[in-house]
A protein has these predicted regions:
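Phosphate/oxyanion-binding loops and surfaces in catalytic or ligand/nucleic-acid-binding neighborhoods
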Residues: 37, 77, 123-126, 139
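Glycine-rich, pocket-lining loop/helix-strand segments that form or immediately flank
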Residues: 94, 125-158
Length: 162
């Protein structure tokens, strides 16, 4: 569960790093499922935008009760999984994703949603971790995705083995 401080951070900054982590076994299961997906459909080696259409086994990870409990703390109890994607971004050689706002691509109005990002490997600034602009969720939606990087922050994460 998220603490009141973590919920406040999400409301103000647009992100939170929960203490909860999937187990090593679960992370390994996801990696194996991804390898199986690529073996069946090599075109998804970098990105699969409709993951559950291709492999329903990934739904098990979206149903993780601890994750659902945290999401419900942020957006309420009426949760609908409307998309699940897999981005494979090997360190330094993975396909770059340019700056964007997810909401520009999502068919949801009002934009009462959130994303759960599950890193399967350690991420660092040097190998290309997730970056975001804190608080940008509170402003008006951007029409253009050309941004100045001066206010961004990086989100390096180390996997915690449990």
């Amino acid at each position: 569960m998220l603490s009141p401080d973590q919920i406040h951070q999400y409301d103000e900054q647009g992100y939170v790093i929960p203490d909860y982590r999937l187990s090593d076994d679960t992370i390994e299961e996801i990696k194996i499922a991804h390898k199986r997906l690529i073996a069946k459909s090599p075109q998804f080696s970098d990105y699969c935008g409709a993951l559950l259409i291709e492999d329903l086994s990934f739904l098990n990870y979206a149903r993780d009760q601890n994750i659902l409990d945290m999401v419900s703390q942020l957006i309420g109890p009426d949760i609908a999984l409307w998309n699940s994607s897999f981005f494979a971004k090997p360190a330094k050689i993975g396909t770059r994703t340019p700056w964007h706002q997810d909401g520009e691509y999502w068919p949801i109005t009002p934009l009462a949603t959130c994303t759960v990002w599950i890193a399967l490997d350690n991420t660092t600034i040097n190998n290309g971790c997730l970056k975001f602009l804190p608080g940008s969720h509170k402003g008006k939606r951007l029409e253009s995705h050309h941004l100045n990087n001066s206010d961004d922050i990086a989100l390096p994460l180390s996997l915690i083995h449990i």
